[in-house]
Amino acid sequence: ARSRSRRSYGRGRRRGGRRRRRRRRRRRGGRRGRRSR
């Protein structure tokens, strides 16, 4: 169970972490720009 959790976590963090960071930056900028305007 531990080896499977480690492999799933590592893959999610490397692939999901990079994609989640890009999506969060775009969502924050869009929401801030709309509220500022």
UniProtKB/Swiss-Prot annotation:
The keyword Nucleus applies. The keyword DNA-binding applies. Testis. Residues 1-37 are annotated as: Disordered. It is found in: Nucleus; Chromosome. GO terms for biological process: cell differentiation; chromosome condensation; spermatogenesis. Keywords: Chromosome, Developmental protein, Differentiation, DNA condensation, DNA-binding, Nucleosome core, Nucleus, Spermatogenesis. GO terms for cellular component: nucleosome; nucleus. GO terms for molecular function: DNA binding. It comes from the Eukaryota. Its main location: nucleus. Protamines substitute for histones in the chromatin of sperm during the haploid phase of spermatogenesis. They compact sperm DNA into a highly condensed, stable and inactive complex. This is Protamine Z3. It comes from Scyliorhinus canicula.
